[in-house]
């Protein structure tokens, strides 16, 4: 079973993900967490791996802050878009681009990295535990993993709010092969277990878009964005709202004491 490659719909991906309030909100909440992680890691410049980094929006922002960023992606088109965006922002010297799948990145890295970004990729890979093991192997002891994944509970809630009862009863099968709907929505409890069994120490959990997608009046997503962001920020790091997020962002540390595997 192959992992998803976005070469065929790179433009649609960019427009639908980042050209909307859902993309803006996702980035806003994500960066609240990342700013906290960076503050905890101290003032030094970091080696950052953005695994499956797509067109590089998050990676470029890291590079703008002076960090050395390695971006890998399975899609050649996404790599090209990321390179162009990095050049436009003037951060190409702080970035390295590798055309490979996240699970193959270890052979391209000479030394471990300090921070790994793995955002909205886990729900597209057929063997998630293998990918997480690879990421563990390329992270230095004491380093941090920033993992954001598509939440199966959020998908179910979204469909129930929409009244898609038959679809939920049928187990929410994927309707088309080549769409932006993830292949493998993840159960958060399962993901947390995978991390803990592998030795990661979970530092924090955040629901991403815990209200936005459920609004009855969709125009409020745009017209009331600032108020919505304020309320998302207030509730997104407490239950039950974490588990209602369309995505969940987990930060986890690789312990100093455990040897690299």
Swiss-Prot record:
Q: Which major enzyme category is it? A: transferase
- Mutagenesis or variant effect for residue 247 to A: Decrease in activity
Membrane-crossing ranges are none
Superkingdom field:
Bacteria
Q: What is this protein called?
A: tRNA 5-carboxymethoxyuridine methyltransferase
Q: What induces it?
A: Expression is positively regulated by H-NS.
Its biological function?
Catalyzes the methylation of 5-carboxymethoxyuridine (cmo5U) to form 5-methoxycarbonylmethoxyuridine (mcmo5U) at position 34 in tRNAs. Four tRNAs (tRNA(Ala1), tRNA(Ser1), tRNA(Pro3) and tRNA(Thr4)) are fully modified with mcmo5U in stationary-phase E.coli. Also present at low frequency in tRNA(Leu3) and tRNA(Val1).
Q: Which residues form a coiled coil?
A: none
Q: What is the effect of changing residue 213 to A?
A: Lack of activity
Q: Where is S-adenosyl-L-methionine annotated to bind?
A: 26, 52-53, 73, 102-103, 119
Q: Which InterPro entries match?
A: Cmo5U_methylTrfase (IPR033664), Methyltranfer_dom (IPR025714), SAM-dependent_MTases_sf (IPR029063)
Q: Which gene encodes it?
A: cmoM
């Amino acid at each position: 079973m192959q992992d998803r490659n976005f070469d065929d719909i790179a433009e649609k991906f960019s427009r639908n993900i980042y050209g909307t309030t859902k993309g803006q909100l996702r980035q806003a909440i994500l960066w609240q967490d990342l700013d906290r992680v960076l503050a905890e890691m101290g003032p030094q410049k970091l080696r950052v791996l953005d695994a499956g980094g797509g067109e590089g929006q998050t990676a470029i922002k890291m590079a703008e802050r002076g960090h050395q960023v390695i971006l890998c992606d399975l899609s050649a088109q996404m790599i090209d878009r990321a390179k162009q965006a990095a050049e436009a922002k003037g951060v190409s010297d702080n970035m390295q681009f590798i055309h490979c799948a996240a699970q193959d990145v270890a052979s391209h890295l000479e030394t471990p990295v300090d921070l790994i970004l793995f955002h909205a990729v886990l729900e597209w890979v057929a063997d998630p535990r293998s990918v997480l093991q690879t990421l563990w192997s390329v992270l230095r002891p004491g380093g941090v993993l920033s993992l954001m994944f598509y939440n199966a509970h959020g998908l179910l809630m979204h469909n129930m709010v929409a009244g898609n009862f038959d679809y939920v009863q049928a187990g929410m099968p994927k309707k088309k092969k080549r769409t932006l709907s993830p292949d493998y929505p993840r159960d958060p409890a399962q993901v947390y277990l995978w991390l803990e069994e592998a030795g990661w120490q979970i530092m924090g959990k955040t629901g991403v878009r815990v209200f936005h997608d459920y609004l009855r009046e969709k125009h409020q997503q745009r017209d009331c964005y600032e108020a919505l962001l304020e309320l998302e920020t207030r509730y997104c790091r407490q239950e039950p709202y974490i588990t209602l997020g369309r995505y969940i962002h987990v930060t986890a540390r690789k312990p100093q004491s455990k040897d690299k595997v």
